[in-house]
């Protein structure tokens, strides 16, 4: 299904107190809402510090194809906050205080028969993996076949850590109001790099993210090590979420899940190519050869270059497909003799997936040539 839009889901994540106060409601004047700004700053810190874990929480084999394309956010974690909040953040960083909040503009429809609409100051950005949408965040990386539980465990834990660190510091402050103000400015300045309101699909963003030092974990295999870092052990251990042993086990299971999924797909591809595609192309080459022979016999002077060129092209692609299938078979056999699940997963990504692509290339070309029959 290459080129067909992948399927995912939006994990709407909101935060409210036990008395019903929405901690993510900026109000009419966000620049004056100190509680909201502190919560936002803590979330920025959490996502920036643990971007690798958040990326890993949405790692499934299918997302390797989906993220960064097919109407899905990129694999680079960033936060979209909209023009209004970005302006407030920049005011606080540059001057130490925010004096105003932008209001929404007008959305030009470009259609003379339709009116222009008021544009929300937060707007929406479908290319962002973690977007603020008025009074909540949307985490948009979770794959359709995956549970949202892993993503929410990570989100809740990393934000809890940021809240705890903020609370520990503020509870010791002699001047609470001044301490809150200073903390907001400090956190916003330290983690400003995680804010990105632009086009997440662009190559320019990939380059900019690298300059900012943001991780770009393009595939599931690259993201799994985030589970077994000292940072992860401390985070989940301090809050009683996972022990070190549980995280190591989860990483092993993730490697196994990836490897088995790719192996099944590779075997399916070998089967399809061997039992359906190659026989169909062989039948078509026979038809072409018979046509060419019949034309030559019936009218030697007739131009048979079309049949000749087509027969040569199809035969060459058939040979390419046969060679690629044999190569993939050999790699699948080699995979069986690798004992470590981590090494199996890397072997799948580094060797088997490129071999699968090498097999599908001639098959895709033949699909545009060989008739439906």
Please name every model-derived segment.
Residues 1-253:
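Active-site capping/gating regions of soluble enzymes
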Residues 189-373:
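C-terminal amphipathic alpha-helical interaction region
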